[in-house]
Amino acid sequence: MQVYSFNLGMLSAMAKGEADYDAELAAVAATNLNVAASMNTGAMWPQGSSNEDHKTRALPEIWSTYPKVAESGKALADSSAALAAVAGDGLDALKGSIGDVGKSCKGCHDDFRAKKK
């Protein structure tokens, strides 16, 4: 999640005008995000484990509805692949694709992550 956040943070700052757009940096950050999002994370939630086994904000629903989690992960992998394909092609291309990544992140966070206390 930290790798996602680091790379998406750079891309979001560029898209919002909080940082200068840099085509090379945007392309690298989007590729990094896609590589991380494309990793098989299923082993992070093995059967028999729970959110009480580690310090985590993961909700129990990750274990009880794992196929839905996998769908959310695929949505992030797909949207980050689309972003990686265009992030270095200009600020407008970045802006046009980053929203789908944000929606993918939000969908998983809304369903599977506890709010900060």
Pin down the residues of each PLM region.
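Sequence context surrounding c-type heme c attachment/ligation sites in exported
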Residues: 1-23, 27-117
